[in-house]
């Protein structure tokens, strides 16, 4: 399948043609997307899990019985991953960890003059929510790139949302990162659930 339907050679275009390409018309359309997202957020705030179920069917074409993935399924995800991929995920985890550990900043505590103490202290959030897209390609590397810095920062709880059904690669990457709360919910409804909470999330 050819995804590059239109190829433009920038140097051969005049100014008006260049501006037209840069205008990104999909973002300049009417407010339909913005209005839809606003409605989704309001419905999740007001109707919780019922709204999540409705939007899973509407947007993901998936009827979710249980949003939370059982911990046993997360742990056993390694059974469905080939050894090369497991190895690659573990190497990536090590590399990402090394990179982010090198960025840890020291606490600053100085006395600028007698009786005046100035501090710069870094405190982690208690819990963070991360969203992992799960469309035509499983973006399990995003799990590593989001969860590892949160762990290093000292976040006690990481909650992951991803559209249903969640790919085993995402589950395995989550397991490797120590994520125990995984919910199969996608889109704006997932972000709203993470922000405002529902009966389940």
From Swiss-Prot:
What's the domain of life for this entry?
A: Bacteria
Q: How is the cofactor bound?
A: Binds 1 zinc ion per subunit.
Q: Name one GO molecular function term.
A: NAD binding
UniProt keyword Acyltransferase present? no
This protein's record includes keyword Metal-binding: yes
Q: Which reaction does it catalyse?
A: L-histidinol + 2 NAD(+) + H2O = L-histidine + 2 NADH + 3 H(+)
Query: Which Gene Ontology terms of cellular component type are present?
Result: cytosol
Q: What is its EC number?
A: 1.1.1.23
Q: Write down the InterPro entries for this protein, in alphabetical order.
A: Ald_DH/histidinol_DH (IPR016161), Hstdl_DH (IPR012131)
Assigned keywords, A-Z = Amino-acid biosynthesis, Histidine biosynthesis, Metal-binding, NAD, Oxidoreductase, Zinc
In terms of PANTHER family, this protein maps to: HISTIDINE BIOSYNTHESIS TRIFUNCTIONAL PROTEIN, HISTIDINOL DEHYDROGENASE HDH
How does this protein assemble? Homodimer.
The record's function comment reads:
Catalyzes the sequential NAD-dependent oxidations of L-histidinol to L-histidinaldehyde and then to L-histidine.
- What is the name of this protein? Histidinol dehydrogenase
The root-end lineage is:
Bacteria, Pseudomonadati, Pseudomonadota, Gammaproteobacteria, Enterobacterales
